[in-house]
């Protein structure tokens, strides 16, 4: 087995690969696709970005493909129902933004857009020169298509054709860039093998495929969402603090997989994490989360996240800016009430209204134990009320029950 493939296998990030890849000698070019279904990349895309970076470090020539054409069709992989089609202008705008993002994260990597070749193919040419090489029987047994065909909603011809378009991408890159390997998440295996078969039918030679595991929880659901929605790599959509807190809140048993897929730590460092996570999962999770955050947002983004995190500890509020409060509120830690409903009211009653405690008995006990905080200061007693001086920047109050359960109250 080639050393680069063995390195991926030792890291336990090989889900599947086609027979013969382990024996390929000489330079290898590999590609991975990113469809512009949104104006930014999300945490799931970071797996692919790290994978391309890792391939480059192992001597493979990486190519990143932006799906300017396939993004207008929609990949049915992993979807229970059909995607809503985006306007052409949206896909174009998204493609430009994602290309810029990939250029920042993957400097020096070749970037291509499949709109450059797919939009040049006429319908007749598509049916005659491409479609005739695909057999319905083979397409219908692909897991993604089979599941959708037998679902209540079914699958449209548009999404059914996605597999053919992705196969043509592989053919185009094989023919024009010498790209013999396509990589992707485990849900892309059917699309990848169809491309390999298409290249063989066109008489170009042997192509290969490789998939890595998706980031999932114990129930097999994709990880990558919070209460407020998708976890984006764009700091304007998901702040560094939100991303950091999201990573810290992931279950301890996901740490080894996160370290393998979302970082560029060496295999030796990964093995060390496997050992340390058994005895000190909190410290290991913080280490891994900070490594990821630094890679995505740089040292300044990491320091911003750590600064806000420190400010939320009891006794530390002064460094929280109005922007920090807004991001905490918008990031799923917020609730809003009219100021008239809060001023002069007992905090004991407000904590119940906001769901931070289950009963007055519970909150009285916590107040006695100095476990209820307003702006990181313990509530003096159960008769304490909300006063104007408790409101930061005219709108915000930071409430906490214990050290971990926190809420930013926005007053209208």
Swiss-Prot record:
Stretches assigned to the S4 RNA-binding domain: 345-412
Disulfide cross-links: none
Family to which the UniProt record says this protein belongs: Belongs to the class-I aminoacyl-tRNA synthetase family. TyrS type 1 subfamily.
Name of this chain's protein: Tyrosine--tRNA ligase
Main location: cytoplasm
NAD is among the record's keywords: no
Species per Swiss-Prot/TrEMBL record: Chlamydia pneumoniae
InterPro entries: aa-tRNA-synth_Ic, Rossmann-like_a/b/a_fold, S4_RNA-bd, S4_RNA-bd_sf, Tyr-tRNA-ligase, Tyr-tRNA-ligase_bac-type, Tyr-tRNA-ligase_bac_1
Substrates-to-products reaction catalysed: tRNA(Tyr) + L-tyrosine + ATP = L-tyrosyl-tRNA(Tyr) + AMP + diphosphate + H(+)
Subunit structure: Homodimer.
Taxonomic superkingdom: Bacteria
Cross-referenced SUPFAM superfamilies: Alpha-L RNA-binding motif, Nucleotidylyl transferase
A GO biological-process term: tyrosyl-tRNA aminoacylation
Binding sites annotated in the UniProt record for L-tyrosine: 31, 162, 166
Function: Catalyzes the attachment of tyrosine to tRNA(Tyr) in a two-step reaction: tyrosine is first activated by ATP to form Tyr-AMP and then transferred to the acceptor end of tRNA(Tyr).
Gene responsible for this protein: tyrS
């Amino acid at each position: 087995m080639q050393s680069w493939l063995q390195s991926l296998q030792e890291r336990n990030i090989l889900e599947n690969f086609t027979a013969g890849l382990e024996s390929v000698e000489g330079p290898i070019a590999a590609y991975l696709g990113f469809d512009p279904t949104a104006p930014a990349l999300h945490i799931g895309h970071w797996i692919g970005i790290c994978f391309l970076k890792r391939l480059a470090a192992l001597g493979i020539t990486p190519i990143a493909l932006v799906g300017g054409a396939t993004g207008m069709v929609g990949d049915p992989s992993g979807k229970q129902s059909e995607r809503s089609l985006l306007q052409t202008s949206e896909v174009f705008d998204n493609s430009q933004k994602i290309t810029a993002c990939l250029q920042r994260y993957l400097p020096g990597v070749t970037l291509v857009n499949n709109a450059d070749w797919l939009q040049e193919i006429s319908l007749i040419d598509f049916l005659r020169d491409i479609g005739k090489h695909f057999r319905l029987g083979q397409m219908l047994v692909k897991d993604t298509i089979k599941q959708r065909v037998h679902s209540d909603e079914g699958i449209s011809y548009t999404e059914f054709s996605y597999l053919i378009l992705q196969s043509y991408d592989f053919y185009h890159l094989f023919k024009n860039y010498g790209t013999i390997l396509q990589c992707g998440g485990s849900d892309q295996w059917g699309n990848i093998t169809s491309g390999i078969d298409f290249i063989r039918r066109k008489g170009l030679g042997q192509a290969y495929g490789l998939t890595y595991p998706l980031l999932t929880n114990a129930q097999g659901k994709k990880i990558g969402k919070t209460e407020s929605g998708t976890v984006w790599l764009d700091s304007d959509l998901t702040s560094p603090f939100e991303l950091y807190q999201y990573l810290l809140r992931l279950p301890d048993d996901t740490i080894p997989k996160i370290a393998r897929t979302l970082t560029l730590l060496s295999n030796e460092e990964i093995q060390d994490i496997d050992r340390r996570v058994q005895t000190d999962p909190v410290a290991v999770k913080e280490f891994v989360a900070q490594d990821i955050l630094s890679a995505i947002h740089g040292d300044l983004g990491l320091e911003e996240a750590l600064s806000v995190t420190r400010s939320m500890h009891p006794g530390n509020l002064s460094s929280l800016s109005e922007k920090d409060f807004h991001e905490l509120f918008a990031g799923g830690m917020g609730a809003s009430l009219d100021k008239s409903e809060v001023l002069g009211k007992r905090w004991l009653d407000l904590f119940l209204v906001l769901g931070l405690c289950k009963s007055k008995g519970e909150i009285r006990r916590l107040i006695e134990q100095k476990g209820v905080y307003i702006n990181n200061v313990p509530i003096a007693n159960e008769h304490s009320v909300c006063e104007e001086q408790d409101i930061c920047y005219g709108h915000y109050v930071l409430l906490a029950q214990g050290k971990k359960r926190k809420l930013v109250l926005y007053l209208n």
